[in-house]
Curated annotation (Swiss-Prot):
NCBIfam families: PRK04016.1 (NF003089)
Assembly and oligomerization: Part of the RNA polymerase complex.
The protein, known as: DNA-directed RNA polymerase subunit Rpo10
InterPro entries registered for this protein in UniProt: RNA_pol_su_RPB10 (IPR023580), RNA_pol_suN_Zn-BS (IPR020789), RPABC5/Rpb10 (IPR000268)
Amino acid sequence: MIVPVRCFTCGKVIGDKYYEFKARVEKGEDPEKVLDDLGVERYCCRRTLLSHVELIDQVMVYKVY
């Protein structure tokens, strides 16, 4: 849904790295190298960034009653 600010497992701040990670991967860079360059070393943080799917634009269409 929304970009996670912290890793769900360890609590490290990762929200500031997501958009740079996404942009570099979309340009064709290897995700492993990008995560290494950004300093994301823990596998739990890497998993959180790699598996995140942005659904907020699709969910915003529905109204809350």
